[in-house]
Regions:
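Membrane-helix interface "capping/anchor" motifs
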Residues: 338-344
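Canonical alpha-helical transmembrane segments of integral membrane proteins
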Residues: 301-312
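Membrane-interfacial, low-structure loops and terminal tails that flank and connect transmembrane helices
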Residues: 280-297
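A structural signal for multi-pass alpha-helical bundles of membrane permease subunits
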Residues: 1-285, 312-325, 329, 333, ...
Length: 485
């Protein structure tokens, strides 16, 4: 167990302290000149840059938009799936497919779908009269780039919220609903005072993980918006400084500023979770207690406020027609608690089918496109009837590099996963079974590396691997993925 703990500490805590030291130095990783200590000059310069504050603003907007959308849609899908029906397992798995893809693949998917001239989305918007075909939407410009990245991220990670919410809904004791039914409680009462308080802690955990990941988002912004030119998040800013300008010291300083913000957000979430669970002071009122003034106030004022914001956002996004569509959907959602259960189940199945079709549409379209001849790909209107060909697949499998890449990826995935499970289990057992001094500090430092933008952790690891001769080797990648995972 000790070698396992030592390896985890070496691969996680060492980069943390090394990057912290570099943040106080004038240093370029591409240069052989040793670091020169300059105090807090890097922090002062990064905090005085307008680009740094703009990246924080952009990141905050992205986090709020994407995480709230994922929460609403994921929870809604979980409510739809929280019933017994045939093929429930298959339907749930289909909803999880986007989450199984890498962010790079998702970014390429949506960049192709949102292409200004040949994208399917612009074509459909033009056909529905929501866009002038002569003035197609440029999804990579400053006006629309944020929405394009939010849509792609929401599509990929909504199933994560759905999965956790579904697990929470399955754990709600049925006896509570039966007792409420005996008292002739309405469906809205059951939802508000039984369902929500029971699954709130799990939803907070899901929100914590998604907020941390969204705050570090890099792949989608880089791929979908011309290398982050129109959606420059903090991770894009760190990447430019660390691996484009090779200002390693400045990049590390900015990353630690980001880390402090993330730690603050994490503590805020943990405080809210403690209130939800009623683990605060003895005289504290739990956050989701029905008699709590906060909950009563939210229940009174939240619906009209949310309604006004929803109407304003819908009008800004799509005009009166879009407001009408949103209004109809909101009316259906409100009425669902007051209609007979058999009608509600029928509506749930219809909504689930529509949601599944919309969710799988990007995957289906990309699958269809993969069988098109190259000449039929970038054409308007898109060709639905064509002669399928396996030419694209044959070219890929005929490439020797592809087979080698698949082999390398498989080896790294299998070996690192097995080692991560074994090492993680042994380390967790050691931390829980034995009295280890500074156990909390060690866990904090290990988890802190997961809060930093990946590029900052990779710079010290890159320097360490370069000195050990582990660059461009399977051993180095397996070691990295094992300890980070």
């Amino acid at each position: 167990m000790l070698p396992t703990i030592f390896l985890l500490v070496a691969m996680n805590v060492f980069p943390l302290f090394w990057s912290l030291w570099l943040s106080f130095n004038d240093y370029k990783a591409s240069s052989k000149i040793p670091p020169k200590f300059i105090g807090n000059a890097n922090y002062t310069e990064m905090l005085s840059r307008q680009e740094s504050w703009q990246s924080f603003t952009t990141t905050a907007a992205f986090v709020v938009m994407s995480v709230l959308l994922q929460l609403a849609l994921g929870f809604g899908l979980a409510l739809l799936l929280n019933r017994e029906f045939k093929a429930k397992g298959i339907v749930t798995t289909l909803f999880l497919l986007p989450m199984m893809l890498s962010s790079v693949v998702v970014g390429l998917f949506w960049r192709f779908l949102m292409d200004t001239n040949f994208g399917l989305i612009n074509f459909l918007l033009g056909k529905m009269g929501l866009m002038d075909p002569l003035k197609p939407i440029v999804w990579t410009d400053k006006q629309h780039a944020m929405w394009s990245v939010v849509i792609a991220d929401t599509w990929q990670w909504t199933p994560f919220i759905m999965l956790i919410a579904l697990a929470g809904l399955a754990s709600v004791p049925k006896t509570l609903f039966e007792a409420a039914s005996v008292d002739r409680a309405t469906e809205w009462f059951k939802f508000r005072f039984i369902t929500i308080p029971t699954i709130a802690p799990l939803l907070m955990v899901a929100l914590l993980f998604r907020t941390l990941d969204a705050f570090k988002m890099f792949d989608l912004a880089w791929i979908m918006t011309e290398r982050g030119s129109t959606v420059e998040t903090v991770s894009v800013q760190v990447f430019r400084e660390a691996l484009r300008n090779w200002n390693t010291g400045k990049a590390c300083a900015f990353a630690y500023i980001v880390l402090l913000v993330i730690i603050g957000l994490t503590n805020l979430y943990l405080m809210m979770m403690a209130k939800i669970k009623g683990e605060g002071p003895a005289d504290a009122v739990p956050l989701f207690n029905p008699e709590s003034p906060m909950i009563r106030g939210i229940g009174k004022f939240a619906p009209p406020v949310c309604g006004v914001l929803l109407i304003w956002g819908a009008y800004s996004a799509g005009g009166p027609a879009f407001v009408a569509v949103i209004g109809v959907l909101a009316a259906i959602c409100a009425a669902i608690f007051f209609i007979p259960s058999n009608v509600r189940n029928i509506l749930a199945y219809i909504t689930m089918s529509i949601a599944l079709f919309i969710y799988l549409a990007p995957l289906l379209w990309m699958g269809i496109t993969s069988f098109k001849p190259f000449a039929d790909v970038n054409v308007i209107p898109p060709k639905v009837v064509f002669t399928p060909t396996f030419e694209n697949y044959l070219k890929i499998f005929a490439d020797a590099k592809f087979m080698q890449q698949m082999m390398n990826s498989t080896i790294i995935a299998v070996v690192s996963t097995v080692l991560a499970v074994v090492m993680g289990t042994l380390t967790a057992y050691a931390f829980s079974r034995f009295k280890i001094k500074a156990k909390g500090d060690a866990l904090f430092f290990i988890l802190s590396t997961r809060m930093l933008p990946p590029m900052v952790v990779l710079v010290p690891v890159y320097l360490m691997f370069r000195s050990l001769g582990l660059l461009n080797t399977l051993t180095g990648l397996i070691l990295l993925y094992t300890t980070v995972g």
